[in-house]
Amino acid sequence: MTRAVTVLATGPQVLVQDLGRPGNAHLGVPPSGALDPPSLALANRLVGNPGGAAGLEVLLGGLVLRAETSCSVAVTGPATPALVNGVPRDSPLHLAPGDVLALGTPVGGLRCYVALSGGVDVPAELGSRSADLLSGLGPPPLAPGDVLPLGTPTGVPVGVDVLVPVRVPDVLVVPVLLGPRDDWFTDPAGQLRAGRWTVSDRGNRVGVRLTGTALEREPGRVGRELPSEGLVTGAVQVPADGAPVVFLADHPTTGGYPVIGVVPPGALPLLGQAPPGTPLVFAPGTPA
């Protein structure tokens, strides 16, 4: 029997993601991978997969799958209703051949993660199965009718008593380390500390766009831009209008707007989960 699941519906977007392909910036390739790596790793652990196995990143729910083989499934991230053959079920769960899994809308975040025992076994590119919509690497967004092959399970599913869902707080406090171009801004730490922003509805896997306080440049820097230079995940880039953009996993590898600071990796998963309209403040610091 072929180990696979068939996609019946997808909602706004469903992508195959693992932990990405870091280390390829010199090729112009961003790291990609799950925007909330801890949630993907937890889902994998619950079904007995290695933490970095490929799973599904589901934006705003709506995914419907039919199992073509017996498999264990875990759904992590924000609290997301899961139904098997129309009956509500708790995660992790087991699917028999022919069972249909349907996911509702997540509460408290944007993206849930679905791990299936054996992992999603699509071809790897540059060492990763992740979909990178900016570079065009990896599989395209899933569509109804797609058949996803699954690998052979190598571990034993782990039972769980209580699965604590991810929830974005009412006000998201984001740490940021100043530099490398904080000298382009008047009192950069003070501006970041005093500013107030809201997550825009124009964000995606490339970055989170913010609306609110416009960051002011030093008088001698107004009207100027930098030659393109390297960017890292978490970079807070500030275009000429002063509205910050925090780069996420699919970010471009170079850019010419000044980067006032960098958000540490541990703070990025919640940013990737923040719905439009989420209030946000920065907590600036300096590298230890």
Predicted feature locations:
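Conserved "landmark" site that anchors the functional core of diverse proteins
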Residues: 1-288
